[in-house]
Curated annotation (Swiss-Prot):
This is Uncharacterized protein YkkB. Gene3D superfamilies: 3.40.630.30. GO terms for molecular function: acyltransferase activity, transferring groups other than amino-acyl groups. Residues 12-172 form the N-acetyltransferase domain.
């Protein structure tokens, strides 16, 4: 594994975001209305650059961020998945986040990558609890959270809308 690679699964390599990823993130995720349905809207190129910078700061400060998900064999961009600090009711909680390009939906990539992040968070980083913050209408994302063993905890108000919090406590 090179220094930029964070995790590897059977099919996916998760690596740190780089400035060069901005165009791909914009073109395949942030400018696709279907992918962004449950977000507050599409992101423009400036917002995409800020997103990459935010993830780079998280990586430097916390050692975790949303990582670029690539096909391990071909290097093709699949999406993003990783762990980011989020505020939930005045507490910092480590969130597993995932978003994949539409053409890769239905292939189990989100579940595979999210499970790897969960394992990393609990086994390598010793996080006591991890969460997924999900728009209640996003049934596909809820299924991913449930398949990796997360359970509905509560609904909070975040990002100017109701957000369902799914949680899982450490394996230990």
């Amino acid at each position: 594994m090179n220094a930029k690679t964070k995790l590897v699964t059977d099919r996916i390599r998760l690596r740190c975001m780089e400035d060069r990823d901005q165009a791909t993130l914009f073109g395949l995720l942030f400018n696709d209305p279907d992918v962004m349905t449950y977000y507050s809207g599409l992101k423009d190129k400036r917002q995409t650059r800020e997103w990459v910078n935010w993830n780079q700061r998280n990586e430097k400060g916390y050692g975790v961020s949303l990582w670029i998900a690539e096909d391990k064999r071909t290097g093709e961009f699949l999406g993003q998945c990783g762990i980011v600090p989020q505020q939930i009711e005045n507490q910092t909680v480590m969130e597993i986040g995932y978003m994949f390009a539409r053409r890769h939906w239905g292939n189990g990539y989100a579940q595979e990558a999210a499970r790897a992040c969960l394992d990393y968070g609990f086994n390598e980083r010793q996080f006591g609890k991890m969460a997924a913050l999900i728009d209640p209408g996003n049934k596909a994302s809820i299924r991913v959270a449930e398949k990796i063993g997360m359970h509905y905890s509560k609904t909070i108000r975040k990002w100017n809308k109701p957000i369902a919090v799914y949680e899982r406590k450490s394996y230990n």
